[in-house]
């Protein structure tokens, strides 16, 4: 049994979805983002795992392919169309200060290489790259000091 929430996402607005008709979420965070993209009126189109970006794996030195979680086309508050590539990751795999274990640190090294390649790819294609962590996806109240 998987430790994380996984399953198939069925969009309520399938006309917004680009590409493959079967969309799989690999975490509850991805599911939350999918629901947002599917339902938000500013999102024009979105795709899940639709692009491959070449990069060199810093742990093995071998060429590899990075498949970001989402590609999104939306209209900003000024009416301009924007395109973004979006990755959903836990903060322990995205932020140096949160990577405590050896595994988290290795994931961070690998992710940093993937994200550098993604930023370069996005710049060449007139897009932006965004990493979403749990603090971006969920609004939580600050803990009270005792």
Language-model regions: role of each:
Residues 1-146:
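Electrostatic, structured charged patches in enzyme active sites and in nucleic-acid/phosphate-binding
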